Amino acid sequence: MKKIAVLGGGMMGSAIAIDLSLSYAVEVIDLKENKKFSGRLKQLNIKTALADLTDFKLTAHLIKEADLIIGAVPGYIGFKVLKNAIKAGKNIVDISFFSENPFQLNEMAERKNLTAVVDCGVSPGLSNLILGYHNKKMKVEFYECLVGGLPFRRSLPFEYSASFSPIDVIEEYTRPARLMENGKIVVKPPLSELENLEIEPIGTLECFNTDGLRTILKTMLIPNMKEKTLRYPGHINKIKFLTDCGFFNSESVKINGNSIRPIDFAAKILLPIWKQEKNQDEFTFMKIIIRGKEKGKPKEHIYELFDRYDKKTGTTSMARTTGYTCTGAAKLILEEKFLKKGICPPEYIGEDENCFKEIMNHLASRNIKLKHIERDI
């Protein structure tokens, strides 16, 4: 039986480990035990270990028997963990939301004859997969992705609960958003171009620019592309207030002789406020719009994903949609169906029609289904 080491045992990492344990021998490695998820892992006889994942020698020792690595750590250490896995000579599928350019590691991965799939969540991830598939079949001229995970129950003040690492949520709110307009990369302020839209079956949500295009700015030669994140109306005004007051600044300030970064303080305060309640009913929604010319005719493809908390398994919709996209890619590598070497964002997988269909079927078998509308324009 092939062995997989999952680096990171939080909400996403544990969901990934549980899914992969159905077919493989899995071990979860993290800095400290996450009691919220570790009990379930032990019930399923999934091995766990504690380690500083930024320590190369220690990590390399722990993963030396693994056939594949899963990177599921917070973004601020994600790039280093990815680099360490490649340095250790391991294929990897990574979901971490790090700010660094993953293609910096392409030469090392190619030299070691490794496959390193990055940004392999829901968005970026599944969204890239879909775009890569259609970009191979048509001349895409416009791409837009709207995505968000929210609780059904709206509770003030934020009407939000973090479906992944809170520090990564803050990073999403503070990182300048890169868009493609008329063939040129344009950098816009985070949270900019706020607009309302109607989402079935939820109702009115607001959306704003976020830096989710990432690798497709380099890999997809499409003149107009943007990604926006969804929240309940009014949420972003509260985030902007905190931003304007300096709570998300990363430069240290002195308080009673102690140095502290405002962003670390804010994350500490917001963590319990944004913490998901046990068995909280929540949903993930994603809408993708692709326009261009297919076989010489103007065509539009619209995909809609609506997934909600799985009461039977206790798995959140964000963990399902992110995690099972990741496990689908992992199976392709382990079964030697996706063989490209180097840094491989999900759009590369989507360009292979068989691989695209395999992952879509993998998701459908886990009751994650996308509605696809195709029409002439």
Whereabouts are the PLM-identified features?
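C-terminal catalytic/substrate-binding lobe primarily of soluble NAD(P)-dependent oxidoreductases
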Residues: 136-377
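Conserved Rossmann-fold cofactor-binding substructure of NAD(P)-dependent oxidoreductases
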Residues: 54-64
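Conserved N-terminal Rossmann-fold NAD(P)-binding element of oxidoreductases
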Residues: 4-8
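Hydrophobic/small residue at the entry helix of a nucleotide-binding pocket
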Residues: 12
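Rossmann-fold NAD(P)-binding glycine/threonine-rich loop
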Residues: 96-116
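ADP-ribose/adenylate-binding Rossmann-like module
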Residues: 84-102
